[in-house]
């Protein structure tokens, strides 16, 4: 954040009912939102997306699905691809009888940039301004 001259403000919501009031408290005080992959945030994405759109705030999310549901963009894991990778590991254990403790820990092999073009346009962002790091 320092490198890009950004100030962070950390907030949380304990239920979907809290989301609207938390967002109202941020309006006019932040330039954008980052939402990690979280079940509560994912279930509130339609509300978050609509409130952020009204406030013209970009929303960077932790997953493609959250960006599709109201976020602006994400650079992260594609859970479908991760599921296929996990399936291959399970196959090695179940069919090839590999011992899990002998297998290397794996992380997602590829990160994906996803831009919700309709959302970006609605808040005044040109999609060519959004680039992967």
Where do the language-model regions lie?
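Short hydrophobic alpha-helices and adjacent helix-cap/hinge residues
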Residues: 1-133
